[in-house]
Structure formats: C-alpha cells, structure tokens
C-alpha cells in the first residue's frame, strides 16, 4: 500500500462518501433558492474534510483495538504504514481545513454543527461511550446521523424541523445496522471488553432490539407534501 493510499484509508472513505450523499440530499431538499454547483462543491468539501478528520482520529485512538480485530487489523495504523504522530497531524490538519472552508465560504452554523458531529464521534463516542455502555451506538449514532442537517444548514443557514426528520431516519436506522455487525463479530468485541449489545445482553435480545428499532422508522414517516421528499431521501 502506497503512502497516499494509507492516508486515504485512514479517512474511512466509504463512510465519508455515504455521509456526503446524505448531506447532498439534505441540500437538495432544503426549501431555498438553488445555490451554484461550485457552492455545493465547496460545502461538501468542507464537510468531507471534517468527516475524514473524525475518522482518522477514531483510528488513532482505537489503533490497539483495531490491531486485534479481524475486521480492522488491515487498517494503516495496525499495519504500521503510518506513525501515530503523522496520522494525528494529518487528522488535525484536514479538520482545521474543513472547518475553515465552512467558516469562510459557507456559514458559521454549518461549521458549528459539523464540528459538533466531529467531536461527538471522534471523542465522545470513541473515547467514552464505546466502552462505557451497550447503548453506545444509540447515543453516539447522533453524530453519524447529522449529515442531512449539515447539508440543509449549508443552504438555509437554519435548523429546520424537516432537516431534523432526515436526521431521525438515520438515527433510528443506525443501531440496527451496527448491532447486526456486532452479532457477527460478537466474540471479537467480547475479547476487547467492548460492551456491544450482543456481548452484554445476548444475540436473541439484540435481534429483538433490531426489530423494534426498525419498526420505529415508521414514526419518522412524513405526510402530505413531505412524502415525496421522504421517498427521495430513503432511495
């Protein structure tokens, strides 16, 4: 793996791409005058840099745990392709760059929300929640559900109830997604003393929670004019 690719993988690109798609949908659904393509690109770039920074910080903090788990042992830090110092400097640099872009060319609200999401995932979830409670992904999932709100705020410079609805959809979907993975990797999480729900409450209970959370998605279904927007977002 080349050095450039190592830094690229440090950013968890697939996760960042999905976040950008959700942010872009938030932009499209915002009820404001259409912004130029260049503006959208700049806003998405700022969000992308901050998301990549959060992912890199997560890998720096979790490097020892990653090295002992099959799912993550091929990441750049466990493989020794990057030093902790270089990875940390890289994460800090792109985080500052992303925040600066949002501050100068988008708006302060989007910058603040994006930084809150970064801190929520990289520090509150990774450092504390992940190892503190089996509800880690329920609480920490809010940071990962933020992209539609970030995209919406970049267009309207406001927090709209419809944007929060989009956040709610992802927020409710996130725990079942991670719990399904945790069931598959249950033994690895147990070995690292990470209290994922299947480890602390068993597989049967976790499957029940998955069903219950998926059923909650119906609560976030919109009515009337919002139905089309909801369908577009889900697609």
What residues fall within each predicted segment?
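Interhelical loop and helix-boundary elements at the membrane-water interface
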Residues: 2-15, 76-87, 124-143, 196-208
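Alpha-helical transmembrane segments of integral membrane proteins
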Residues: 18, 38-46, 86-90, 109-113, ...
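Membrane-embedded alpha-helical segments that form the functional core of polytopic membrane enzymes
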Residues: 21-25, 29-63, 71, 112, ...
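Functional transmembrane core segments of multi-pass inner-membrane proteins
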Residues: 32-35, 141-182, 186-187, 203-204, ...
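Cytosolic, membrane-interface loops and tails of multi-pass inner-membrane proteins
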Residues: 61-82, 179-206
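Multi-pass membrane catalytic core of lipid/isoprenoid biosynthesis enzymes
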Residues: 71-112, 201-220
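Intramembrane alpha-helical segments
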Residues: 84-154
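Single conserved hydrophobic/aromatic residue that forms the stacking wall/gate
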Residues: 217-235
